[in-house]
């Protein structure tokens, strides 16, 4: 039997489809026939009926039909299912044979053509030899047929043709060869499908009829066979629900069969076939849980049915194939839309398949381990006359034998031997690797990283057993990183051991050294004697010698590798290996630590390198060197020691570069930083520890940064969380876990020895030239050279502050937006020891709020460090926050001549502009002057003068001004610009040079309206009781029209009056009329005047309410005074 016997048959795994053969088509030489065939087969869409087509000649011989049994009473079956039965009904025995014939209804030679067609049909029937296969005829015609019933000739000839061919009307079809060929073909397919359905239905009934004659005593195998056939025919009929039902019945019947070593393989084979079908249909019906449940049941029922103990590897192979097949089904269902999860995906089944393949390998190594003198039996017990088995699952040397007793034990023994010898040639590792690879792909897809890593390790080990060491090393190397990062030290040690063997057998020197370094380290769980052996081998490699073989390696592979190692020794190639230890865990640990996070440039930079070895024996290194981001410092940080090659493994702890296991060794370095590195970070980019010498092989252990390896971060975290008290060590020793890596330090400038003081009077006032006095005093012992001052707004603040802040050195300057916010590098000169100087800075702040100002003083000075003179740049900076406030608030309002608030003014009517300046400054303010600048649309009634000139305002005090203005008529209806109000002010200070600040306040716009009539009243400021009070009213026409005015006077209780009580006037455009009244006050006090009422006939909207804005309504009346006579004076 061949190894492929465990593969499921192709006819079992494919989707069963109705088989239809097409005859009468010449697809090679006839273009019409070729077009018909392509329409049937090419580019079939998923929605077309499931039919398998095949073109055969008309006289093709189909498989012969055996004579049917009339009784099963004495019939004893020889097996369950014949190996060719499924293929026969899928590809050999058609459900329908279609005869294609070119014949039109108007064919002149109709009789001859009809007879020829009938002959072809009869030949097909003869070749089917009594099978139930349906026969149909398709007439290929050139013309499109008329609708049914309209072509009488066609109907008559169709009936005649059916009669001649012995066909029903449903079995005769017409295929016009037109542009719509595909559409006709699809309709033909549907008709063919119905005929095929009928055929398979008939076959199912035929098989069921046989079951009536069976008994369970001698026909147990037939029960299974018939039930399988019914299910298979149901699948061909596309009745998958009934197919699943019958497959389940067949599966139960299989397990009811009596099992013995002789028929165990046949039972398992058929159980596997039927289980595959059940699971496939469950996935097809979208019931994956039923498929999984069926498969678990199948495995539980079959895993104990091992069969012959001498062929136990066959059971493992069969179990492996069951899991692999189910995994394939599961994966196929996922590709068709099924959703899987992490805990239930095909990977688990591929993994189990791989485990059984590994078990098969182990059993084969035990059972097939025959002596080389054992030869393969002759004749071959596995050969058959036909080259294939008659029944699935039977032994070739006893086919059809149902007896449990072996009639020929010697033949059985030879058969088992041949199977064992063939199994010995199977490449088990390839099978295992393929299955593991499938499982890895699934676990990667469903994001199961640990399962993926676990299986990759097994793949690597399997490659190792298959002697493909390069692939093994590649896989193991990939997985090591994950186990290192998670701290699985035992697993890591096992993987490293296998990797070391691979690198040894391939004579890969660098890999061998790398894995040896890690197996000697603290992460390795090897025993000390194993570590000692590895350490000695490592030293041999470094001395350019061949290492001793690794234990448990294949003898032939070891012999080949020793030759490779000898070749490596003799080659005069590069013997320097640089190993980046950041990604693994070597036996030497390294930590670099600067003594401080920053150093002044005039102080030597100092740092320590701590080394610790974890190998079994003391080991001597040849060189230690440190690299920095500035390579100029590398030359100062090197330790080197020469020794003989034989002294690498040093038993004593003497020597500068000798590391004793478990002891921490410290190396101290110092150097003077360069002045150009001030403000920069000095970083240790790498630490190189060199093992070996140039005369042998040299290994450079390279730590990136300040040391640490793949386990350092995890160990540091554990140490930080640990509450365990550390034992006390001698003064010159430290706890390794307590050391923290400090791989960088800052070089900062020398500490300045000058003082900077700032003097000012906060807060600052908006737009004033605020004075900030900077006082610099030197306390240096030598001259401070090239002193420079930078002053202004500190960078990094709001951009709006930068735009609204200006700095200058001269207070008399008028700052605008062109002045900077920061004055850099103002030269001051040299400062002698103890010398002091002052520098005033003037700042203009255009907006309120807090600002941070920077004063930065830098200078150069000579100093000596470690006997080396350097020029240091020192600096001192001071910051101060200055609050800016408004100096005053200005209130602007418009009022009438009666001092009433105006929300709008009237053209050519005088009104008042009132300003009120309220001091908000904590310091006294001097208002130097004020100025009103009117716009072109506004005029002044009188001379504009400042009434607040040289007024000093304390906090909270205010100063007011009043201006009488007039606005000419305007054309637009919007607001009119008034102008601006300019206040010139400064802080009140005895210093005359305090600059004056001009603050411009834009006056609000006013709405100007025109009125048709303006009324002005001339009357005294007060009246007296019973004294005449003359009042004159001026009525001025403000329009271009003649105004008809009705004037009336409404009396008051406090006055009598003389004049016209009611009058009608006509006022010409631009002119005025006067109306004169004499009022006679009757009582003292603030009395209401008689009311003047005006009615404009052309402007009915002109109201008296508007009139009252222009004329007074009340007047103060004094009491009547006594006349001074002599008597009264005397009495007084």
From Swiss-Prot:
Question: Could you tell me the Gene Ontology terms of the biological process aspect for this record?
Answer: vesicle-mediated transport
Keyword rRNA processing in annotation = no
**Pfam family for this entry, one:** Gryzun-like
Which keywords are on file for this protein? ER-Golgi transport, Golgi apparatus, Transport
InterPro entries membership: TPC11, TRAPPC11_C
Q: Does the keyword Transport apply?
A: yes
Q: Where in the cell is it found?
A: Golgi apparatus; Golgi apparatus, cis-Golgi network
Broad class of where this protein is predominantly found: Golgi
Family, similarity comment: Belongs to the TRAPPC11 family.
- What PANTHER family does its record include? FOIE GRAS (PTHR14374), TRAFFICKING PROTEIN PARTICLE COMPLEX SUBUNIT 11 (PTHR14374:SF0)
Q: How does it assemble?
A: Component of the multisubunit TRAPP (transport protein particle) complex.
> What name has this protein been given in UniProt?
Trafficking protein particle complex subunit 11
Which source organism?
Gallus gallus
Q: Which gene encodes it?
A: TRAPPC11
């Amino acid at each position: 039997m061949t190894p492929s016997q465990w593969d499921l048959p192709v006819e079992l795994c494919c989707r069963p489809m109705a088989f239809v053969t097409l005859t009468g088509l010449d697809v090679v030489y006839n273009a019409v026939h070729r077009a018909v065939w392509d329409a049937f087969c090419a580019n079939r869409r998923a929605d077309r009926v499931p039919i398998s087509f095949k073109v055969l000649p008309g006289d093709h011989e189909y498989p012969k039909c055996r004579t049917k049994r009339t009784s099963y009473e004495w019939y004893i079956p020889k097996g369950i299912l014949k190996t060719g039965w499924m293929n026969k009904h899928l590809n050999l025995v058609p459900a329908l044979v279609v005869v294609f014939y070119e014949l039109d209804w108007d064919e002149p030679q109709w009789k001859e053509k009809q007879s020829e067609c009938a002959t072809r049909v009869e030949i097909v029937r003869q070749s089917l030899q009594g099978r139930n296969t349906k026969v149909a005829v398709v007439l290929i015609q050139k013309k499109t047929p008329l609708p049914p019933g309209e072509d009488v000739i066609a109907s008559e000839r169709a009936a005649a043709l059916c009669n001649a061919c012995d066909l029903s009307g449903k079995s005769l079809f017409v295929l016009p060869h037109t542009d719509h060929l595909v559409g006709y073909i699809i309709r033909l397919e549907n008709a063919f499908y119905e005929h095929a359905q009928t055929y398979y239905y008939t076959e199912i009934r035929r098989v069921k009829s046989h079951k009536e004659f069976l008994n369970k005593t001698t026909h147990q195998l037939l029960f299974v066979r018939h039930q399988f056939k019914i299910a298979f025919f149901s699948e061909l009929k596309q009745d998958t629900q009934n197919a699943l039902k019958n497959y389940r019945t067949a599966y139960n019947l299989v397990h009811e069969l009596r099992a013995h070593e002789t028929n165990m393989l046949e039972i398992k084979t058929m159980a596997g076939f039927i289980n595959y079908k059940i699971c496939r249909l469950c996935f097809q019906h979208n019931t994956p849980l039923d498929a999984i449940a069926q498969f678990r049941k199948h495995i539980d029922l079959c895993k104990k049915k091992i069969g012959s103990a001498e062929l136990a590897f066959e059971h493992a192979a069969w179990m492996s194939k069951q899991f692999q097949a189910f995994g394939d089904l599961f994966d196929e269902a996922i590709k068709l839309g099924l959703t899987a999860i992490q805990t239930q995906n095909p990977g688990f089944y591929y993994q189990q398949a791989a485990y059984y393949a590994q078990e098969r390998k182990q059993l084969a190594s035990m059972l097939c381990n025959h002596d080389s003198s054992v030869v393969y039996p002759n004749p071959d017990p596995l050969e058959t006359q036909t080259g294939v088995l008659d029944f699935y699952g039977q032994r070739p040397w006893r086919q059809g034998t149902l007896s449990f007793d072996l009639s020929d034990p010697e033949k059985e023994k030879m058969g088992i031997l041949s199977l064992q010898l063939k199994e010995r040639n199977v490449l088990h590792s390839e099978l295992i690797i393929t299955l593991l690879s499938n499982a890895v792909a699934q676990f990667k897809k469903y994001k199961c990283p640990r399962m993926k890593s676990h299986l990759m390790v097994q793949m690597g080990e399997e490659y190792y057993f298959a002697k493909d060491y390069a692939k093994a090393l590649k896989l193991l190397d990939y997985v090591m990183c994950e186990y290192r990062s998670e701290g699985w030290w035992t697993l890591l040690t096992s993987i490293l051991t296998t990797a070391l063997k691979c690198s040894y057998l391939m004579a890969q020197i660098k890999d061998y050294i790398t894995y040896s370094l890690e197996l000697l380290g603290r992460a390795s769980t090897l025993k000390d004697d194993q570590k000692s052996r590895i350490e000695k081998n490592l030293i041999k490699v470094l001395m350019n010698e061949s290492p001793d073989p690794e234990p448990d390696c294949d003898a032939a592979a070891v012999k080949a590798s020793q030759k490779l190692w000898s070749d490596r020794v003799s080659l005069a190639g590069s013997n320097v290996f640089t190993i980046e230890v950041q990604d693994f865990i070597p036996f030497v640990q390294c930590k670099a630590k600067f003594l401080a996070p920053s150093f002044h440039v005039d102080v030597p930079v100092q740092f320590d390198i701590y080394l610790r070895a974890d190998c079994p024996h003391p080991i001597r290194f040849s060189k230690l060197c440190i690299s920095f981001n500035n390579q100029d410092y590398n030359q100062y940080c090197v330790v080197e020691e020469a020794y003989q090659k034989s002294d690498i493994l040093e038993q004593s702890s003497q020597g500068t570069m000798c590391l004793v296991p478990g002891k921490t060794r410290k190396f101290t370095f110092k150097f003077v930083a360069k002045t150009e590195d001030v403000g920069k970070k000095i970083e240790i980019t790498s630490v190189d520890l060199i093992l070996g010498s140039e005369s042998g092989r040299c290994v450079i252990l390279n730590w990136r940064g300040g040391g640490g390896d793949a386990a350092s971060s995890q160990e540091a975290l554990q140490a930080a969380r640990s509450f365990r008290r550390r034992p006390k060590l001698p003064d010159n020793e430290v706890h390794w876990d307590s050391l923290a890596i400090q791989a960088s330090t800052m070089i900062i400038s020398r500490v300045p020895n000058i003082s900077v003081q700032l003097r000012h009077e906060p807060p600052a006032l908006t737009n004033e030239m605020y004075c900030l006095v900077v006082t610099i005093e030197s306390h240096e012992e030598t001259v401070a050279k090239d002193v420079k001052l930078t002053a202004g707004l500190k960078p990094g603040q709001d951009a709006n502050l930068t735009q609204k802040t200006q700095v200058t050195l001269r207070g008399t300057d008028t700052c605008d937006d062109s002045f900077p916010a920061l004055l850099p590098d103002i030269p001051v000169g040299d400062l002698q020891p103890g010398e002091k100087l002052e520098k005033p800075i003037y700042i203009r702040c255009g907006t309120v709020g807090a600002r941070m100002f920077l004063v930065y003083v830098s200078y150069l000075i000579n100093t000596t460090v470690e006997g080396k003179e350097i020029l240091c740049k020192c600096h001192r900076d001071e910051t101060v926050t200055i609050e800016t406030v408004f100096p005053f608030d200005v209130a602007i309002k418009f009022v009438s001549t009666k001092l009433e608030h105006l929300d709008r003014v009237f053209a050519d009517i005088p009104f008042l502009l009132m300003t009120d300046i309220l001091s908000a400054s904590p310091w006294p303010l001097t208002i130097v002057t004020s100025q009103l600048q009117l716009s072109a649309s506004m005029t002044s009634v009188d001379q504009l003068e400042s009434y607040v000139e040289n007024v000093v305002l304390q906090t909270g005090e205010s100063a007011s001004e009043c201006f009488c203005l007039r606005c000419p008529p305007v054309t637009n209806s919007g607001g009119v610009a008034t102008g601006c109000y300019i206040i010139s002010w400064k802080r009140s200070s005895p210093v005359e040079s305090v600059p004056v600040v001009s603050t411009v306040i834009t006056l609000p716009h006013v709405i100007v309206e025109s009125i048709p009539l303006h009324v002005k009243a001339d009357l005294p400021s007060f009246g007296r009781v019973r004294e005449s009070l003359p009042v004159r009213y001026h009525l001025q026409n403000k329009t271009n029209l003649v105004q008809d005015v009705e004037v009336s006077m409404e009396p008051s209780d406090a006055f009598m009056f003389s004049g016209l009580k009611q009058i009608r006037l006509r006022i010409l455009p631009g002119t005025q009329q006067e109306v004169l009244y004499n009022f006679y006050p009757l009582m003292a006090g603030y009395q209401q005047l008689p009311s003047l009422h005006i009615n404009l006939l052309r402007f009915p909207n002109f109201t008296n309410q508007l009139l009252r804005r222009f004329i007074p309504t009340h007047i103060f009346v004094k009491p009547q005074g006594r006349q001074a006579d002599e008597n009264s004076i005397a009495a007084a």
